[in-house]
Amino acid sequence: MRPPVKPPSKEKFIAKKFITLSEFLDEYVQLYGLNHWGASYLSNNRHRIEHYIKPYIGSVLLRDLTTHDLDIFYNQLLEEPAVILKGHKRTDRTVSPSVIEKVHGLLRSALNQAVAWEYIARNPAQYASIPEYTPGERAIWSEEDAASAIQLCDDPILRSAMLLAIGGSLRIGEVLGLTWDCVDLSDPAQPQIKIDKELERLKKEDLEDLKRRDRSKVKFEFPNWKKTPSTTVLVLKAPKTESSKRRIYLAPTVGKALADVKAAQEQAKALCGDGYTDYGLVIAHDTGRPYEERQIAEKLKAFIQEAGLPPVVFHSLRHFSTTLKLQISNGDIKAVQGDTGHAQARMVTDRYAHITDESRQHLAQQMEKDFFHRSTAPASPVSTSQDADMQALLPLLQKNPDIVKLLIATMK
């Protein structure tokens, strides 16, 4: 016989009744976050909790938190100084609306869980108002600018990284995490790469927490080359989603650049001898060590300034690549999705299909040529058009009499 369910203890009920938002968020991360979030998302959410939520409303009792409290909190954040991450330049900027939007999303998710756990009856974040803002569009190069960048860049590392981002529609972590065992240059006319990992720097605390839950996607941890202990670790990890694992066909120009990089690495190995550590990385220092995202970003920024090109960030190259492929393929979203690794085709069109001024101008010109030119031109005699059609159709009917039967059948 099933034993009776024990009612919750009085102590537990009292604890639930007087739990603060800060205490609840700690529990939320442990019971929910560590079972659902990846390392980067876990790190970002912990940062938002510690720096943007707890200092302001962490002491509020969970049961007392209202929608009005959250509206006041979000407006207060607009006037607070933004938190400066370690290694970043100090600025006088206040918390941006985009950060507040992310904080709100985190609180809404957490408070939904509070409802599920019966801490509260309703979610006060459901009807809270966040400051409105229009996200700025990410600047991308035109085809002419991108072509100039490839031609002008004489840094083999940066050029190869740009070619992979543009030719393969890769994210920066996928570019830096690409290894030679995933590169196939056996057919120079059709080089291929396989994306099954990415390079990323993670907080050791977050990584260890996920390891204890057997949820770490890390394939390899690089050693710490600093002379002092570090709270972070550079890793090669599996992509966030299964759809990000993919095979990509590259243009021969990209394959040729990769072959040149491989040859240069072999020379570096010979020169460095034991000083070269071979991690198998395509984008690597002369000692074999990996490049990090900020190092490539610095290279790109310096090159853009020197070349006089419009300023863009490295991720803009992926945007440019996706847009260009959509245009070249006449909107073959599935083919482009295969390169970008998006889980859903809609994400390609919603996030990356930026219609440039050139394509919009071309569209207007095509409308003039294909539609308006005919609609405003003098009308031709119908009989002339019909005669021309019959002249074109006659040889086809002579070669294939079955078409005559089909035409007769459609007239009935």
Stretch-by-stretch model annotation:
Residues 129-130, 145, 178-266:
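Conserved tyrosine-mediated DNA breakage-rejoining catalytic core shared by Y-recombinases
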